[in-house]
Amino acid sequence: EPLPIDTLVAGLPSAFNDLSETGWFDAAQGILTTDTRAKGSSLQYGQDRPITITGIAKGSGMIKPNMATMLAYIATDAKIDNELLHRALRLACDKSFNRITVDSDTSTNDSVVLVATGASGVVIDEDTFESFVGHLTDIFIQLAQAIIRDGEGASKFVSVAIEGALDESEALQVAYTIAESP
């Protein structure tokens, strides 16, 4: 069935008028497919001038490997250059979305979008990068775990920890073998 472009275009003015800083829950509801609940997380850190990181996600099946049919949208008001933001995205994904599986099935599409508006005026540089990535990873993990908890047909949430592996690659191979066993 062709995408109804005219209908989409006609709805844009209304969609733009409905935009708000507090519309995250509405957005989380709007992206659901087979999910049973909206998934979102937000935090602020920093004393004098706090940084906010907020995200939403969808997904409940076909999650492995490396995200599969899940979508995640995360925004921060931190001011950070593109290179550092891209590095932060990779590091946070590698500890969260790229570590989950629901049914071992794969898909052809996945997305994690991370944007930084700079609205807080707080600059993230090499000195503050590690703290930023830690907080960003917390949000990513909360969203990834929410996807697992909403997994199609899932009745359990299991974390697998591997010790004594030669390297991270071997640990992941063992972990996925355990996680995907019948």
Q: Where in the sequence are the language-model features?
A:
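Generic structural hydrophobic/aromatic packing signal, biased to beta-strands
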Residues: 31, 44, 74, 114-115, ...
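Structured core elements
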Residues: 52-55, 73, 101, 113-114, ...
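Flexible, glycine/charged-enriched surface loops at secondary-structure junctions
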Residues: 21-28, 97-109, 142-159
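Glycine-rich, mobile lid/loop segments that gate access to catalytic sites or pores
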Residues: 1-97, 107
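A glycine- and small/hydrophobic-rich beta-loop-beta segment
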Residues: 117-182
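Acidic, glycine-rich loop-and-beta core segments that form the ion-binding/anion-interacting portion
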Residues: 81-143
